[in-house]
Amino acid sequence: MRVPFVVYADFESFTENIDTCSPDESKSFTKQYQKHKPSGYCYLIKCFDDEIFPPMLVRQTIQKPDEDIPQMFVERLESYIKMIYNNFKFSKKVKMSLENLREHETATHCHICKGELGKDKVLDHCHITGKYRGAAHNECNLQFRIPKFFPVIFHNLSGYDSHLFIKNLGTSKGKINCIPNNEEKYISFTKQIVVDTFTNKEGKPVEVKRDIRFIDSFKFMSASLDSLVSNLSKESFKNLTSYYEGEQLQLLLRKGVFPYDWFGDFNKLIATKLPPKEAFYSRLNDTDISEEDYQHAQKVWEIFEMRTMEDYHDLYIESDVLLLADVFENFRNVCLENYGLDPAWYYTAPGLAWDAALKITKVNLELLTDYDKLLMIEKGIRGGVSMISNRYGKANNPYMEEYDPNLPTKYITYLDANNLYGWAMSKPLPTHEFRWMTEQEITGWKNHPCILEVDLEYPHHLHDLHNVPPFGHLA
């Protein structure tokens, strides 16, 4: 099922300089030279059906130096989530046309699992729109439920945006869960909020809770937003084109540029002209922007008739959110079309790929319960550097100055094999019915698909030659 509501978000920050002592360069050190204070945020609330809930773009820029932008972001986001829940908390009755009725009567396969239908055939419909979706097994229909979470997607949430507002999640009631990558970075974190209350049959008040799940699009597409945007066709920018058109749209069909290091305090917002090209220098990357990028920024300022840097700031963050929405919505469409899976249900690409593999191959993996079997398989796992090197080679070919036509023609070719793990995983792999072999089967092991643990007789004269890597795995 496509997750009905998804939020795409982004923050921008002032980069305040920090006065500090020079570090001892004879030792390893981390130098803090900037403090990032949020200057504004923007998010797009995207529904799977624009007719019942048109896209909602929310943007807030700091208006006073002491405003708490992260707190405003959290409070406003929670209020919109509560509003969405209460608008759609009651299931819509199914709307069946004559065509839908005929389709349901003649259906022979479940539209969810694609399996053959029997006596448990039921009608499946969308509880938000009331539209008929197809015939399904009763069990499939019961599991095909609207999720109890709302994904909020940032690009590079783990590395940047999460540090700006995660503390503010604790200022309101609700449990917070996280999936940590390490002490500083999180794969995802979730804030539970109360969206409604009702009185049960015993007369006791009951709270209805939903999760706001923050996930990182970088965990699915590990490239810069600029790179991801460049891979899309013009027709793919449906969210951007719903807000801009003509020359303005053409200017925004790429990632913009922003003078991060120059943008150091609240007063920069009231600047009445674009800063010079030198102001776009990045201390972090030690790079300047190109002349082409600066001309693009100047044209954006002119075409959008900007008066202050606040206008430029607002457009920059807004376009980033719309571009992210278009990139991830296209990614969702591709995954749904090819695998029938929505990435918005997942935390990372490996989790999505794992479910896609199980679904496409229809393999049921057997759980190993024999400890000895598990240990034996673990012993056979090898990894690390994989290479085959020739210590000495002499070429002889027409492209060489010292080519000898009387000798065999020889070339020295460097081969680089990529994705060895992926290649191995695409080969036939054991999945089930694991058992120990009998003595008779071991004698004729070549006739059975098997994993062998053996003792090797390794002549001493081969030890140095096969030192790295050894011919067989060492138990």
Segment roles from a protein language model:
Residues M1-A475:
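Metal-dependent nucleotidyl/phosphoryl-transfer cores and adjacent nucleic-acid-binding surfaces
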